[in-house]
Amino acid sequence: MKSAEIREAFLRFFEEQGHTRVASSSLIPGNDPTLLFTNAGMNQFKDCFLGQEKRAYTRAVSSQKCVRAGGKHNDLENVGYTARHHTFFEMLGNFSFGDYFKRDAITFAWNFLTSDKWLNLPKEKLWVTVYASDDEAYDIWTQEVGVPAERMVRIGDNKGAPYASDNFWTMGDTGPCGPCTEIFYDHGPDIWGGPPGSPEEDGDRYIEIWNNVFMQFNRTADGVLHPLPAPSVDTGMGLERISAVMQHVHSNYEIDLFQSLLAAAAEAIGCSNDEQPSLKVVADHIRSCGFLIADGVLPSNEGRGYVLRRIIRRACRHGNKLGAKGSFFHKIVAALVTEMGEAFPELKGQQAHIERVLKTEEEQFAKTLEQGLRILEQDLAQLQGKVVPGDVVFKLYDTYGFPMDLTGDIARERELTIDEAGFEREMEAQRERARSASAFGMDYNSLVKVDTATDFLGYDTTEGQGKVIALYKDGQSVEQLTEGEEGVVVLDRTPFYAESGGQVGDSGYLQAGAARFDVRDTTKTGGAFLHHGVIASGALTVGATVDARVDADVQHATSLNHSATHLLHEALRQVLGEHVQQKGSLVDSQRLRFDFSHFEAVKPEQIKALEDIVNREVRRNTEVQTELTDIETAKAKGAMALFGEKYGDTVRVLSMGGDFSVELCGGIHAKRTGDISLFKIISEGGVASGVRRIEAITGAAALAYLNAAEEQVKEAAQLVKGNRDNLIDKLSAVLERNRQLEKQLEQLQAKAASAAGDDLSNAAVEVKGAKVLAARLDGQDGKALLALVDQLKNKLGHAVILLGSEHEGKVVLVAGVTKDLSGQLKAGDLMKQAAAVVGGKGGGRPDMAQGGGVDVASLDQALALAVPFAEQGL
């Protein structure tokens, strides 16, 4: 039975038991910022188990893609060396949210595993564990299912504390928890190992295939377990493990899914397809890398991106070890798509993107991999003992891009370990240097503590009345602000938009009789809106009623830029690919800035395509529509949500151009797309590894920008005595004439240098039988001096030469030694000494060297080194 067939059978079985099939969630957890990657089937249902979210179903089944690499759950260092460790795996799971409990969960599991309609596993091969005091589960297994007592094992608190057990699950020190029951498969007496709970349980004979967790208690801080009103079930069965059982193999790498990837890896590398751990590493890592990139992660030096980079570089190193020539890793993506693309369509849709990202990362790492490996070999050759020092590990990380675990991998192959504590000390020292070099600012919002919330009126109006419910000065609550004092005003209701979602806060003023407070910015803490500004006149007190007026012109310009940002986001996905995700934005009245995930610079023709798409939507002049709904309905309509953003029960969906752009957004926007008038991109560049930034302008600012550009074109045309139509031809002619003149100048300089060479040769002095010449030729560039040194070497025959020049405000130096003397005197050594005198650097071959510096006043002193240099060396 193939892996794909097992996956589908599992999903179909539970659908027949009334479960709703739920698609795998992203590897980037959308509802848990504490989690690096999705690592279990229950992650996407966490809020359901906690009672914080209600769904249309109470029974669910899924095949969840999971990654365990980095953070608490890190299998990276074991991958390739064991039969069952992976960075990526699939978790089959069925779930009950206050619906069925132990009896049904146990019966479902047993029927799926043993029924001849489904997996038809021999019952006598299955062992079961339960928590020691869970008599209910034990009785269901023995009395209702019929598992004999000799294949039942009670597991107590085997981890040194109450409820610390392999068979008791907890979400944390407090909160939902409960016993679990695990099903094991016995591979037979030919494999070493003992049953669960025995001293030999770590062997490979008895393998856990399914875990059923019964969330039945809530543990309080005092350690007491209180029964939950609606117990739930969370189960998990690794697809790779059950596939190994069904295909009668003992290693996950022997199942059909991995066999195709191993073959593809061997072909891409150009090695034999055997049992080498390095080949298993590559086959495993293509899965995690492919799926992470498909879900929007790009290689970088922090967070999820750094974990991805570590996995890619580990795969590259193991490919290099197997003899890979050039980049190979990206070539395996096609096999991954063939194997898993049907179950996970995002792989098919992102194949070209995944290949490009991997190829780019491979090529970048290849530049330092060989050099780093040589350095490591040198350090290991000098190593005394069995531990690689932390400073060596850090040097490889900091200089050559070797993640710590990659160096650890290499050390492990030599039966060495690495000094992780020493590495961390070096890292902390680097962080401290960075902190010392940083400027620190204070988060003023964090000083303001307001319990009440502000009602926002700004979607419908730019003015309204509100009551002052709090005033702050220097972060401290006050009863009054007087003329000239800066502070923060909190109202019970306001038309001012508070900074969020990339849109800056509104400005304007608050008026209460003679008192006027000029609002410079608006922010938010909790549910309270903070109006930051200064008292322009009078005094403002707590309890006063104010007329709040937003600067409507500034807000309108900001709203146009915000709407244009949404149109740009969709245009980027159409032009560059669906891998594009928003990484940040800043929208004010002057311009918009949009950061997004992409692996290379946006090409000029792509910039034009982006502008064309956005301006097309602007010309369509469609209504900008908003709708309040729940998050699941919004996602079903295709609304884009930002990863890591926490959304409430009700969300605001913003649509433009019908379904052209549909996003969750709480910002202020144009009424119609035509209000934007014009969209123009003014810059594009990189801000971090895998993150690009576009800046653009709209409306009157865009028109002014184009008018200024038109004026520059006219001025340029006048300078070359042309017009708009023939400007390019005129400029091309000027540049060609300039190239010809530069060529003529070089020829004249060469002739002048040649003539000077005849005169200079007469200025050489004799030192111990050799001619030594040092001369200053201001105005000559390095190219001319090189040619002259060559000429003088031929003319003098047995010589040491040092020429210098002041050229464009800097010192240029060239040294030469005839080959018959280069065994005794090195031109590079002379250059290092001379360049140091003029505050620069230099070097080169024994017979020819170049250098320079910035201290023109010391040039003569540098040239004077030639004679003593020759005297000492001859």
From Swiss-Prot:
Please list the cofactors this protein needs. Zn(2+)
Write out the GO cellular component annotations.
cytosol
Q: Which HAMAP family match?
A: Ala_tRNA_synth_B (MF_00036_B)
> Any idea where this protein resides?
Cytoplasm
Q: Which PANTHER family does the protein's record reference?
A: ALANINE--TRNA LIGASE, CYTOPLASMIC, ALANYL-TRNA SYNTHETASE
Q: What EC numbers are recorded for this enzyme?
A: 6.1.1.7
Q: Which domain of life is it from?
A: Bacteria
Where along the chain is Zn(2+) bound?
Answer: H562, H566, C665, H669
Catalytic activity line of the entry: tRNA(Ala) + L-alanine + ATP = L-alanyl-tRNA(Ala) + AMP + diphosphate
> What does this gene product do?
Catalyzes the attachment of alanine to tRNA(Ala) in a two-step reaction: alanine is first activated by ATP to form Ala-AMP and then transferred to the acceptor end of tRNA(Ala). Also edits incorrectly charged Ser-tRNA(Ala) and Gly-tRNA(Ala) via its editing domain.
Q: What is its main location?
A: cytoplasm
Protein name in UniProt: Alanine--tRNA ligase
Cofactor remark: Binds 1 zinc ion per subunit.
